[in-house]
């Protein structure tokens, strides 16, 4: 969800569709709102003023920092995995 919100503010439906498109994961309403509640509690996202009964969310600076750390770690692990697979092919 942080990856989705890094691309701009989104309300729940737009967030669900975006995550489904780039990650292939369908988030149910319970899962979505529980995750948003945790992210908001941890100050990684903030809820903005409602627009036409839709409540958009925005990633915070702290959320961007956490996302950058997670992406760097994922990149490091992917690189290590590819290196080890190449060694195993020899």
In which residue ranges do the predicted regions lie?
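N-terminal helix-turn-helix DNA-binding core of bacterial DNA-binding proteins
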Residues: 1-31, 51
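Histidine kinase transmitter module recognition
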Residues: 4-7, 48, 66, 70-73
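Conserved anionic group-binding/transfer micro-motifs
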Residues: 15, 63, 74
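Basic amphipathic alpha-helical segments that dock to polyanions
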Residues: 32-34, 38-39
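Beta-hairpin "wing" of winged helix-turn-helix
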Residues: 40-52, 58
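Basic, amphipathic "hinge/linker" alpha-helix immediately C-terminal to the N-terminal HTH DNA-binding motif
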Residues: 52-71
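Amphipathic alpha-helical dimerization/coiled-coil segments
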Residues: 68-90
